[in-house]
């Protein structure tokens, strides 16, 4: 009997044996992050943690890549109708209309409203990190911008050798809210990426210690499944204790305070003079053209 795949608004969930599988499922938009995705992610992670049959949580993306970051076309172009979501609590920080008004260059920016939204998104991503059970992320194609928040919040990465991983919004209009780059690759390499907005391929990610496994596309699924199966053989109690033990190292290094700064800085980055200018460019010429003009001088147009 085949396991039943449950389809939510932004992802799918299923359990096969000892593995809970969460698949980002917006391939037509590059699995772009919406306000709903972090909350659905957290709900699925909690469900897996409460399932006595699940030992390990697998995260992957449907389509040509893992995740291209936030789905910003409507918001960056200030298309109020394009981002309306009738199921969002009206007037709340999660109401896209509230956030659209808060990003209007002609209006007044409320940093607390911004923080309330982005901190909740971060909580959703960090559910992978806080999960008692281990989380393993498969990266293929592209994993850029906000997509790296989900990947870096996972315990282990299995990546395609040619995958592109990075944070291009470091050039304008963004700061990584998870603030995990320095913890995952060290301060010097984190600065190398964030001070340029450059990306690395999967092979480099493995060399830097960011990825635990790397494989060509034809072998990626096999390598991913092999690791999941090995983890799935370990008793849940052992997995929980060892993950908590290692995570405590990051807690003691000030991760929570660093992330609070990352969330605030991300909001500020979207409201600096150059941030407003870039948003105005997106409103006038379209989001894709604004990204092209941002990235073309660096020779890597189209990475996020």
Please give the residue ranges for each predicted region.
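Terminal peptide-recognition signature
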Residues: 22, 26, 40-41, 59, ...
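C-terminal alpha-helix plus adjacent terminal tail
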Residues: 1-17, 78, 84, 200-202, ...
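Charged catalytic carboxylate motif
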Residues: 36-40, 120, 127, 223, ...
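Glycine- (often His-adjacent) and acidic-residue-rich active-site loop
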Residues: 61-123
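Conserved CoA-thioester-binding segment of acyl-CoA-metabolizing enzymes
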Residues: 1-64, 76, 82
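Glycine-rich, phosphate-binding/catalytic loops in enzymes
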Residues: 38-40, 73-77, 168, 175
């Amino acid at each position: 009997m085949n396991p039943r795949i449950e389809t939510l608004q932004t992802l799918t969930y299923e359990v096969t044996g000892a593995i809970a599988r969460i698949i980002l499922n917006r391939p037509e938009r590059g699995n772009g992050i919406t306000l709903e995705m972090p909350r659905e992610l957290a709900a699925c992670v909690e469900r897996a943690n409460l399932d006595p049959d699940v030992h390990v949580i697998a995260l992957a993306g449907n389509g040509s890549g893992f995740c291209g970051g936030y789905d910003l076309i409507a918001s960056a172009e200030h298309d109020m109708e394009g981002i309306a979501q009738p199921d969002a609590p009206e007037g709340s920080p999660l109401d896209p209309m509230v956030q659209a008004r808060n990003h209007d260059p002609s209006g007044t920016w409320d940093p607390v409203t911004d923080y309330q939204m982005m901190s909740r998104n971060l909580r959703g991503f960090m559910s992978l990190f806080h999960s008692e059970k281990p989380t393993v992320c498969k990266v293929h194609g592209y994993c850029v911008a906000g997509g790296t928040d989900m990947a870096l919040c996972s315990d282990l990465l299995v990546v395609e050798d040619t995958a592109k991983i990075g944070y291009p919004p470091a050039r304008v209009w963004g700061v990584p809210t998870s603030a995990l780059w320095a913890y995952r690759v060290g301060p010097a390499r984190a600065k190398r990426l964030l001070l340029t907005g450059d990306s690395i391929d999967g092979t480099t990610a493995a060399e830097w210690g960011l990825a635990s496994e790397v494989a060509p596309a034809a072998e990626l699924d096999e390598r991913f499944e092999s690791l999941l199966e090995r983890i799935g053989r370990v008793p849940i109690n052992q997995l929980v204790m060892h993950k908590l033990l290692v995570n405590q190292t990051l807690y003691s290094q000030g991760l929570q305070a660093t992330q609070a700064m990352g969330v605030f800085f991300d909001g500020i980055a979207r409201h600096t003079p150059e941030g407003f200018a870039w948003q105005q460019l997106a409103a006038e010429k379209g989001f894709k053209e604004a990204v092209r003009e941002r990235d073309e001088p660096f020779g890597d147009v189209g990475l996020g």
